[in-house]
């Protein structure tokens, strides 16, 4: 069992910022097309975090041209090159599945205001 724990610790990333459901993220994803590789940015609201350790995943939702798009990313995957927190959201749930039914201003998440000294 200790061998698996040490392998998990080696493959975990340390450059991932803290974020929670409700936060708006920019996820920089490596996309391989043939023999070329490029970075694609996916910006949206985190609607869930699931799992723990190396197997942890998070789901980001955005509305593109009136169509809701959700992508689930493994947190410690080499496919995710970078994660940036754009804004912090103030929500009371860990899973924000209710955002799927909301449209327009109703789907807007209140921004978390932090004290100036922090």
From Swiss-Prot:
Keywords noted in UniProt: Ribonucleoprotein, Ribosomal protein
Any GO BP annotation: translation
Gene3D superfamilies assigned: 2.30.30.790
Ribonucleoprotein listed as a keyword: yes
Source domain of life: Bacteria
Alphabetical list of InterPro entries matching this protein: Ribosomal_bL19 (IPR001857), Ribosomal_bL19_CS (IPR018257), Ribosomal_bL19_sf (IPR038657), Translation_prot_SH3-like_sf (IPR008991)
One Gene Ontology CC term in the entry: cytosolic large ribosomal subunit
Disulfide bond annotation, renumbered to this chain: none
Keyword Transport attributed: no
Molecular function GO labels: structural constituent of ribosome
Function: This protein is located at the 30S-50S ribosomal subunit interface and may play a role in the structure and function of the aminoacyl-tRNA binding site.
PANTHER family: LARGE RIBOSOMAL SUBUNIT PROTEIN BL19M, RIBOSOMAL PROTEIN L19
UniProt family annotation: Belongs to the bacterial ribosomal protein bL19 family.
NCBIfam families the record matches: rplS_bact (TIGR01024)
Protein name: Large ribosomal subunit protein bL19
């Amino acid at each position: 069992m200790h061998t698996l724990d040490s392998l998990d610790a080696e493959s975990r990333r340390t450059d991932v910022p803290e974020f929670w459901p409700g936060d708006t993220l920019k996820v920089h994803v490596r996309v391989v097309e043939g023999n070329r590789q490029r970075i694609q940015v996916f910006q949206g609201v985190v609607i869930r975090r699931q799992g723990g350790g190396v197997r942890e995943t998070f789901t980001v939702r955005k509305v593109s041209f009136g169509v809701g798009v959700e992508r689930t990313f493994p947190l410690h995957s080499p496919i995710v090159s970078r994660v940036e927190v754009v804004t912090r959201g103030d929500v009371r749930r860990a899973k924000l599945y209710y955002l799927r039914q909301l449209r327009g201003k109703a789907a807007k998440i209140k921004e978390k205001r932090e004290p100036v000294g922090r």
